Amino acid sequence: MALPSAAMQSNPEKLNLFHRLSSLPTTSLEYGNNRFPFFSSSAKSHFKKPTQACLSSTTHQEVRPLAYFPPTVWGNRFASLTFNPSEFESYDERVIVLKKKVKDILISSTSDSVETVILIDLLCRLGVSYHFENDIEELLSKIFNSQPDLVDEKECDLYTAAIVFRVFRQHGFKMSSDVFSKFKDSDGKFKESLRGDAKGMLSLFEASHLSVHGEDILEEAFAFTKDYLQSSAVELFPNLKRHITNALEQPFHSGVPRLEARKFIDLYEADIECRNETLLEFAKLDYNRVQLLHQQELCQFSKWWKDLNLASDIPYARDRMAEIFFWAVAMYFEPDYAHTRMIIAKVVLLISLIDDTIDAYATMEETHILAEAVARWDMSCLEKLPDYMKVIYKLLLNTFSEFEKELTAEGKSYSVKYGREAFQELVRGYYLEAVWRDEGKIPSFDDYLYNGSMTTGLPLVSTASFMGVQEITGLNEFQWLETNPKLSYASGAFIRLVNDLTSHVTEQQRGHVASCIDCYMNQHGVSKDEAVKILQKMATDCWKEINEECMRQSQVSVGHLMRIVNLARLTDVSYKYGDGYTDSQQLKQFVKGLFVDPISI
């Protein structure tokens, strides 16, 4: 019996996930002699929806793709955290007073547009810009529209020009990269004299990460500055050296905002000559204040899981409560999004459980039964599931029932349907990967990446997060996500590429589906080294697509788009040196900085 599409059941005219790519504009990218239809409709023509025979097939032998996942490094530590209301109130009172002072500083800067933009950048880097979100949007819009030639008018040096360029682009304003033309010589190369300006070179390096397709000047800027920064960092003053080392390790634009704020506060404090004491105190107090809220929420989430007492029923699954909550905070760290974070955390936990079940334990026959049950979304399916899957299936349906009750009280019960359908589509993608694995099939690269961009969980997590956002009060954002927009696909493709590039060896040792590397090698007849280089270039180009989509007119606000971008940022951080989710040692320092260690006041 064919696995039904829940989305198609509810609306026969609605495009199935596997057919949505046809709605995207065609943008082909060149990679040597290989033309990759990255965002084109041609991928659709190669992608075959699983046939009834395929969906009905089962293995003749019960083969479990058993895997060993290391235990959590945290134990039950976070389930026993205590929250001190008086400590939070003390921070809160001081933050309220300082917030007024900082707003006065922001307003007083408006007489000089460049000074305003630099201050906005400082607030963003310190992690406190969310307090003044509306003011910042209004100020930047006014400056951008009234002073389109701001950099030339003010005769900005390289350091300042790059900050202005980066700030506008990061807020969705497409400032022209031509602002950097004046820093080139008569031969069209960046002036050698710029090498004497370390701060300016660092600023240009950070700005170059906001490039879009076709901006050769930013490609040149990246190569020029990276070469200089890598070779000269050892010769600089200690604090500037730390700035450069951090930027080379993790550029600000592709970093997780909350982690970047933690790092920058320390660097700003060390800059004794230039720091503003009011801004510094405000940032430190606010960081610790918000950290207390995150600790309380992580405790609630950990206790919720512990009280379910399900771990013994699914011992093969990864125990990653702290890392899961790291996902939630990476997307939405601001205090007002507590409910959103809890929804994200529970959904990511469910994704992790089902992913581990299909990927590392279930037989093909069991995977088929689970996929059908998720597609039908009905408790009556329990009787067909093996006992260990019943636990997961009940948790899935019960959790979404809880979401519906909570969101009904907020007038958003309609949003749960979109989350449910996104979950069903995710499991369809998992099932297809299991079929490929079971048949020993290496799919075409285009087919693999298209399906793989969805099985990253990004479309589902994005949808689930929007369910909990109070300012999203209608269907607009959910209907936009349903179209598999280019931002979502580019972010998902980036996550899939980075994930595979760092974890494919370990996963294949336990019989995982072919990775993007295998698919590309098989389709194009290139060596592994060649494939890796090409895929790394594709991952870089994903960021250009992401940047472009955040700077074009959209039915969704830039603020909401950035939450999807944050998932790509999270992957950039978590998979930089391996699978940081599976090996929780790799994320330990980040979890400590977010949830354990406060900033010294």
Curated annotation (Swiss-Prot):
One of its GO terms (cellular component) is chloroplast. Transmembrane segments: none annotated. It is found in: Plastid, Chloroplast. Mg(2+) 1 binds at residues 355, 359. Keywords: Chloroplast, Lyase, Magnesium, Metal-binding, Plant defense, Plastid, Transit peptide. Binds 3 Mg(2+) ions per subunit. Mg(2+) 3 binds at residues 499, 503, 507. A motif (DDXXD motif) lies at residues 355-359. It catalyses: (2E,6E,10E)-geranylgeranyl diphosphate = casbene + diphosphate. Pfam families: Terpene_synth, Terpene_synth_C. Its EC number is 4.2.3.8. Mg(2+) 2 binds at residues 355, 359. Its cofactor is Mg(2+). Residues 1-56 form a transit peptide. One of its GO terms (molecular function) is casbene synthase activity. Induction: By oligogalacturonide fragments released by fungal infection. Detected after 5 hours of incubation with the pectic fragments and reaches a maximum after 10-12 hours. One of its GO terms (biological process) is defense response. PANTHER family: ALPHA-HUMULENE_(-)-(E)-BETA-CARYOPHYLLENE SYNTHASE, OS04G0344100 PROTEIN-RELATED. Belongs to the terpene synthase family. The Asp-Asp-Xaa-Xaa-Asp/Glu (DDXXD/E) motif is important for the catalytic activity, presumably through binding to Mg(2+). Catalyzes the cyclization of geranylgeranyl diphosphate to casbene, a diterpene phytoalexin with antibacterial and antifungal activity. This is Casbene synthase, chloroplastic.
